[in-house]
């Protein structure tokens, strides 16, 4: 049976975007010691996996940043770094979808 998981925090944890207290250990989207990785998704016959790109914007602020709004730019740059990290793990089974056609 093919299945789709619509939310997974693995990417956020691996890139430090989520403060979970979980030790990263062997870390990577292809294989890790968390709940989801590409190897196990393939073994389970997953049709798709949506990795969350979570950041806590307050982690990027100080008094000056809060006043000039740069907090959102910093948080967005962190999200872009997460998608770049995921792109490094792409192969024939594991790809980033950026549109409905993908």
Say what each PLM segment does.
Residues 1-102:
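N-terminal hydrophobic targeting/anchoring segments and the immediately downstream early-domain regions
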């Amino acid at each position: 049976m093919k299945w789709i998981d619509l939310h997974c925090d693995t990417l956020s944890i691996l890139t430090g975007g989520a403060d979970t207290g979980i030790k990263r250990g062997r870390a990577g989207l292809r294989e890790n010691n968390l709940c989801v990785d590409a190897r196990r998704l393939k073994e389970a016959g997953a049709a798709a996996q949506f990795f969350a790109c979570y950041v806590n914007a307050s982690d990027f602020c100080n008094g000056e940043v809060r006043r000039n709004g740069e907090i959102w730019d910093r948080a967005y740059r962190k999200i872009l770094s997460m998608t770049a990290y995921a792109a490094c793990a792409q192969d024939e089974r594991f790809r980033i979808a950026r549109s409905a056609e993908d």
